[in-house]
Amino acid sequence: MIILGLHMGHDAAVALIKEGKLVGTSSIERFTRRKKDSVLDLEYIRLFLKGYNTTLEDVNCITFSTWTKQLAPWMDIYSPTDAVYPLAKFGTWASNTVITNHLEGSDRVELTEYGYTLPDMIHRTSMPYIASDINTDNSFHINVRIKGIDKTYKGLFVDHHMSHAASTFYTSDFEEAAIFTADASMHHTEACSGFFVGMGNQIQQFRNPEYMLGNFYDVATEHLGIGPGVIKAGSLMGLAAYGRISKKAYDNWKEWTAPQSIRKFDKEEHRYIDWLFTQISGRFPIVGEKIRASILNNDPESDQFTREWQEPFTNKESTSQEAMDIAADIQFITERSLVEYTQQLFEETKSFNSGNLCVAGGTFLNCNANYKIQTETDFDKMHMFPACGDDGTAAGSALYFLHKHLRHPRQKYTTAELAYSGVIWYDGHLTDGEPLDLDVVADYLNNDKIVCWYDGASENGPRALGHRSFLASPKNNSMKDKMNARVKFREWYRPFAPIVLAERAQDWFVMDFETPYMLHTVPSKKPFDIPAAVHIDNSARVQTLTKEHNEKLYTLIEKFEEKSGIPILINTSLNVKGEPIVESPDDAVNLFKRSDVDILVINNKMWIKNA
């Protein structure tokens, strides 16, 4: 059976299962070249499938990750001919509005500068009394059709947090595990977190812990003037290292973030988050009931008035010491809360779990918090899917159908299979390059030159893991400023990540585990030897690399170590500010031409500027 997984919403994504195994997954932004894109046009799905010698006509089932508890009550409102509300719902992520009861011929509606809605792909649904098919809280079936294709597909709609849970558990090596999902819900009625247990092919949610840290972090990011939380939350994490944690936050974080604090606002998360931010910054007054009600009803005028009244930081103010200190408090509260909540999960599951933890959801892109979870809770092992944000839910919904519904035996995945699950592109039209010489590339790196590195299939998730990377030497601190200002064109305070030979990682960093997907920030043991690869607090978001994982890049780092004595390179995503990571060879060539870098490597060829 061939299963196509789809996620519509910010970080829209596609995933493919063939012969009982996840073989491919990708964020749509890589194809559309629009950051955080939410559109799922048919042409991009076809383009993705073509990379795996598959067509839409070959597909047997389509799965969707969504908020099933929101959709279920609407199932009996429309007749089978007009019952497209559920599919319209998948096209939006920024409001609770019923968009239309006809999708055919509808155009995209621009929500923001980076988000679109109402994909044209879905034409009609066939829904004879769907309510009778809704037998669980986590998924339901309907038949779906795609415009222009004379075929009816089996469709499975899987709860958003269940999709997160499935993405991490079913790709782990664990027979049983506790699962923690956490993100920022766009809908005030929806859960922002979940506690699950996984055993064999089964996943079961046993508690909704009501944690809202993702929403809190996103709101803080926007009101500190950094930008929309869905895009810029990582910048807040970088900025926090320059701040000082206040005694107020240190003394009160547990009380502020306890579930009883949330419940006293009658589960109106926006009021709670306003209150929590006020405790920290004093700049975010509690919004009046009338105004808040208007916001929840999506009244744009009231929303705009509220934004002005709250007086958020300007973008210029976002790097003031006051903003840095607030960012430090936000990060501290997030880290301590996640450790506390994860330990609660351990206590609630220790009677039947052997110490395994799986996590997923955008909140767990917080690499600083992940290190604290890894080292300060009683769990022995921790697994994360590389695409742990919403882009991973396309794969999660497909895996849920495969293992939970079809009861197909679980598969083992290598690190490389999970890291590099995107499309492999044809590069035969690039005929003018020189044969790749890793010794030459290592020499250039050792002389503080910057390399565009493009190799094989694209990465799964938001991190550059060695197939779409800028590579540079970590030896000189000036490299950090050069790459931020002249290559990446981004904020000066953003750090760069090191990639290190796995067997040498403990010589350079305080860690006793591998982090192949660059999802942990760890302390550095030798920060003065690699100043360009550590942050202001001497931490680093490390990627560990084995020869089995990526032999070509591993060999390059070995050669660099022979010349420099350092088994580490800077590894940052092959893009510039505001753009997705490059996808195709042509994308890489275009970026090389407009970037202040010295060498371009595409698979087994290289190009040297001004050679």
Predicted regions and their residues:
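Extreme N-terminal starter segment of soluble prokaryotic enzymes
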Residues: 1-4
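A structural motif corresponding to the C-terminal end of an alpha-helix
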Residues: 139-154, 563
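Short glycine-rich phosphate-binding loop at a beta-alpha junction
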Residues: 56-67, 155, 352-362, 452
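Conserved active-site "lid/cap" helical segment
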Residues: 12-13, 18-145, 243-329, 341-342
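Short acidic-aromatic active-site loops that bind/stabilize oxyanions
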Residues: 155-158, 316, 320-336, 546
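Phosphate/ATP-binding catalytic cores across multiple sugar-kinase/actin-like superfamilies
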Residues: 329-353
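Flexible beta->alpha loop and helix N-cap segments adjacent to enzyme active/binding sites
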Residues: 7-28, 32-35, 54, 77, ...
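An acidic intrinsically disordered interaction segment
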Residues: 130-137, 188-192, 206, 292-302, ...
